[in-house]
Amino acid sequence: TVLLSAQLPPLASVLIGVGAMLLVMLLSAAHWHSERMPHDTPMLALPHGIVLFIGVLAFVAFLGEGAMLDWSAVFLSDVRRVDASLAGVGYVTFTLTMTVARLFGDALVARVGRQRAIVFGALLAAAGVLVLTLVTPWQASLVGYVLVGLGCANIAPALFSLAGHQTRMPGALAITAVSTLGFAGILAGPALIGFAADHFGLIAAFIGVATALLLVAVSTRWLRV
């Protein structure tokens, strides 16, 4: 968005972004960890029990992220009537906030615990969605995007950590299953929101996302790992 606002061509903006990601990968490659799975470990295992429950929570958490990634600009443009050149500011605000919050997430989770981090994150994200949908000035909507970014930042990592520490399934398989369900949420979620927005409006669809995030916060009482 910043590069496009600076009048760079779309292709140049994409190439710069790809180059930056490749540079980060090369610089971080020396710190990657490798782990070999035992030969008798199945390649695919269906989640069950607590792992399936964690996966469903991950689906909802990623659905919230997907809503911001795919619908934030549409919301500002169509609902708040923001000029198209500024519609991407919500996306940028959300992603930058989530990135910074995720960098400091380990310290937060270590201080409050995984389950409390999920509760606080889900409540904060739900509050952010409600702020950006119910508060009219579009500048105030940016506060909502900040809250959603802060809230969503550490829900998924905490859920992945819970999946790795449970005893119902091997940790590596459980994390794989939970992450698969989670990323299904980030893929299918925006389509579900589009379907809901087509029938009930985008504000109602976003309120549905906030409700789902509140259910994540409530559901953590049944997380016994």
Q: Which role fits each region the language model picked out?
A:
Residues 2-6, 13-38, 219-224:
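C-terminal membrane-cytosol helix-exit motif in multi-pass small-molecule transporters
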Residues 2-19, 192-213:
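A membrane-interface helix-boundary motif in multi-pass transporters
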Residues 48-64, 146-150:
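Pair of pore-lining "gating" transmembrane helices in MFS-fold secondary transporters
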Residues 70-86:
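Short amphipathic helix-loop junctions that connect adjacent transmembrane helices
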Residues 101-114, 197-198:
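Helix-to-loop junctions at the C-terminal end of transmembrane segments
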Residues 116-131, 207-210:
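Structural signature of the two symmetry-related core transmembrane helices
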Residues 128, 139-147:
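Paired small-residue
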Residues 154-167:
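Intracellular juxtamembrane helix-capping segments at the cytosolic ends
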